[in-house]
Amino acid sequence: MANPVFSEKVFRSTVTAKDTGVMTVGGTAIKSLVLIFMVLIGAMYTWKVAYEAINPASVQPWMYGGAIGGFVVAMIISFKPIWAQYLAPIYAVLEGLFLGGISAIFSQAFATTAPGIVMNATLLTMLTAVVMLLIYRAKIIKVDGKFARIMMIALGTIMLYYISTWILSMFGVNLTMLHNSGPLSIGISLVIVGVAAFMLLLDFNFIEKASEAGAPKYMEWYGAFGLMVTLVWLYLEILQLLAKFAGNRN
C-alpha cells in the first residue's frame, strides 16, 4: 500500500473496529463521486473570484488557504481514519479552492499559447483514472507486495525531489532546467505523472481488499479520501506537464 494515506497499520486496526455496517466498493465509489462534486464546488468559487476580481491577486488568500487547510485536514484524517466521514468533504472543498485558483492562473497564463489547458488536464486526469481502473479490473498488472514496494521507492524519490528542489530554491540555487520547458524538465514530469497514475492501482487495491476484509462503513469515506488525494496530485502534475509542452512549442 504505497499511498501514505493507506498505511498497513490503518488497514489492520480498522478491520476489527466496531461500526454499524461494513465497507463496500460500491459505497466507496458513491462517496468518491460526492467528494469530486465537493471539489468542483470549491474550484468554481475560486475560479469565479479569479476571473471577476479587479485585482487577480485577490484569489491568492483563498487558494493558499485551501492548500494549507487541505494539508492539515489530510494529516488529521491520515491519523484518525474514523474522522474521514466528517472531514473528507471539508478536505474536498478546501482542495477545490486551491485547484480552482491554480487552474485559473494557468488558464490565464496560457490563454494564447494553450487555450483549454485546464479542460485538457481535467479530461486527461479522468481518462487516466478510467484506464487505470480497467487495467486493475483486468488484472493486467499484478498489484502485490513487490509492486507496492516499488511504488513506495518511486514515491519516496519524488517526495525527496520535491523537498530538495524547494530547499535549494530557498537558497537561491538556479533550478531553471528542472522547471522550464526543456527535455529534462518534461521527462521528469512524465515520470511523476506515470507514478501518480500507477498509484491509482494501489488505491483501487486498498479499497477492494478493505471491503473484502469487512472494514467498517466509515472506511468508505477514508478510501474515497485517499483516492481523491491521488487524483488531485495527478491533475496538478498533468496540468504542469501540459504547460511545459505549451512552452516547448513556443
PLM regions with names:
Residues M1-N250:
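A hydrophobic alpha-helical transmembrane-helix feature that marks the membrane cores
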